[in-house]
Amino acid sequence: MKQLFLVLFAAFSISQLAACLLENRRWRAINKPFLMLTLLLWYCAAAQQVNPLFAAGPALSLLGDVLLIFHGLFKFGGTAFFGAHLCYIAAFWRNISLRQPLWLLAALGYMLVVGFVLHTVRSGMKKKMFALAVVYLSALSAMSFSALLQFVSVGGAAALVFAGSLLFVASDSLIALREFRRDIPIPKPYFLVMATYIPAQLLIALGMSWLG
């Protein structure tokens, strides 16, 4: 059964990327919810031991994907993904040891990245939206930072999770630029967002299915 779910995820992923390339908005909207649905089903079937904290991440991402289809629900979609990042953080921290000194330098690096993204998009945001962006990007960077600490602590499959987290940061940074800095041209922005988001979620799920 897990092979079937993975094949379905791959098929919906290819379909979504094609819809983005062809700029077919209706096709994108119909196809999008099936990405996280099939990935979540695959994780539950493939994991040696299903981690409920982690499984809540793809579930909330599915909710976020559905909400973001509708333009008026952007904040609600962002809130769902904010919750997904918190679930990922909680799941990653079960495998983390802070005995490695790398975490201090890594924390500084993530702060610089968040600061750069916020500085870039600030001119296109109202104050309230900017405050929400600060909170969201802090959670996103904390998720990726936690994935790095997990990799430093346990190695192995945690490398996939960390790589996925970096792609997630890239994907959400592209969304921020697309929504709030339209003066910066991004070729095929929907395609680039999904081309980073899809492998991000897949790598995170693959790694966590082995780590437990």
PLM features: residue spans?
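Polytopic alpha-helical membrane-helix bundles and their juxtamembrane interface segments
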Residues: 1-212
